[in-house]
Amino acid sequence: MAENQNAADQASTLNDERATRLAKRAALFEAGQNPYPEHSEVEDYVVDIEAKYAELADGEDTEDVVKIAGRVVAKRGQGKIMFIVVRDATAEIQLFCRINDMDEAAWNTLKALDLGDILGVAGVVVRTKRGQLSVAPKSATLLSKAVRPLPEKFHGLSDKETRYRQRYVDLIANDDVRETFRKRSQILSTFRRFMESDGYMEVETPILQTIQGGATAKPFITHFNALDQECYLRIATELHLKRCIVGGFERVFEIGRIFRNEGMDLTHNPEFTTMEAYRAFSDLEGMKALAQGVIKAANKAIGNPEVIEYQGQTIDLSGEWASRSMTDIVSDVIGKPVTIDTPVEELAAAAREKGLEIKPEWTAGKIIAEIYDELGEDTIVNPTFVCDYPIEVSPLAKRFEDDPRLTHRFELVIAGHEYANAFSELNDPVDQAERFVAQMAEKAGGDDEAMEYDEDYVRALEYGMPPAGGIGIGIDRVVMLLTNQASIRDVLLFPHMKPEKGFQSGAAAAKAAEAGNTASPFVKPLKPTVDYSKIAVEPLFEEFVDFDTFSKSDFRAVKVKACEAVKKSKKLLNFTLDDGTGTDRTILSGIHDYYEPEDLVGKTLLAITNLPPRKMMGIPSCGMLISAIHEEEGEERLNLIQLDASIPAGAKMY
């Protein structure tokens, strides 16, 4: 209740301040002043002013006129002197405002400013007696009136959901966020320069495709009305780029968006950026050199040392990166030697001992890949090329000549995550056609991520494709690594989010705005949005339990220290919880359809803690989080029980 009241108070305060600012805006228009003028003059930037006048003495004025513009981020003073801090695209600078330095209109403009307004000034460069480099305005122009106030704690907006939904506010409020996206831009530029300097040509391939291919992933499906044709947003650029190799281009690359209709977690977003590159007359060794070269170049471009810190781990990017076979890593994980010749029964038994679920139809290669994915990848810290993938999980890679069960493929793994995937490309059209047929059989068996048969691609291979190496690098993950960000959302300007509760868009928003006669609706007071007439709940149990039985159930308040999606699971979230004992508790819960993991960090939840441990996806789950479930218009709805934050971890519930 206290939490709801606090939110309601904040909404009321926001509405009051916004109304005041809207009134100021209206008054300006009534006075014949446009608070959103078309023209502005900016000739100088703060960072250049700081460099040029670094030696200016304390208390010294110049006659040098500069013209700057920026957002008002601080304001103080009264009477005949005011101090205003503005921020432009490069840095912040103080405006030393003296009433005698300007006309009355300019002074009134400065007096009426609110935090967040965008201001243009012309003035002279001075240094105050206290040593603060400043601009003393001679004229001032309001360039944009901000009618919505900045967050109360301007320097350090911390609520993650607000930061992701309103990235524009996040960029205003947090210097480190702006720096992350500057570095992302530098990394992308470095990738392009590196590739071009190595003789690669950048090309563009279709985003809208008629075949689901190039990767094993679930696509977004749309309809092309003009041709009455079902289409997909691309899940990879691979097959079109290799058509370019067939056509005679020896080195091609593409940096672009990829779309996969799958889950969201710390390292996955439904749309993301990759670089794919293909080089004729090359192989895996050439792709290893490319991966090392471009990532090291990007790391250097943003000013990082060769040894970096990533989420508490020390990563050494220097020297030649290691290469290991997948079977070597799996051997370490299960504690005994494994090869592709190890009997299926033995592999399955070893996997089940580690808590993995193995399907009876799986082959040795599939089981080895599963053990590696679930248990091996996380053990890798420094950059490692994991090589020699089984054919079952590599439908586009070239087979070993001496063992067709293995392929010439590697994944680059750093800090337990994949950053690149590379093949010695399959160029035998008959072999490729057979693998497409096998993929279609898997699709017919219910695997909606399996590739479709691409007849035109097989036809292209029939004309002859030279031996080639190919690689795909996840740009977003590279940015995460080099900027030390834990979540992919922290390196995407506008990550995909679940719909905001109570927030309208499109026609509904326009109708609400028209009804309110404002540019956009005010913050709505908190009120129930559920139509309870359409709710169905499970009937109460008729069987009673005695108090002794009930008292044996240990319900406790727990605080979420960390939460992440479980690999290979679309529903499970892995919670690290503080239960008041001083030892972290792990509980898995199948609620990913309803919650994003990062949104739950810091929350206080209700758990039953004395259930016996139960393995889920190989991870022991010690207890259960309590949720409320009901049906609404035939669909199940789930709400995780969230407690007041003031309740301490470990508090017992009765």
Language model segments and positions:
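Class II aminoacyl-tRNA synthetase catalytic cores and aaRS-like
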Residues: 1-543, 549-559, 581-583, 593, ...
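Short Gly/aromatic-enriched secondary-structure transition segments
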Residues: 86, 572-577
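An active-site-proximal beta-strand-loop segment
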Residues: 564-565
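Conserved RecA-like helicase motor-core motifs
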Residues: 586-587
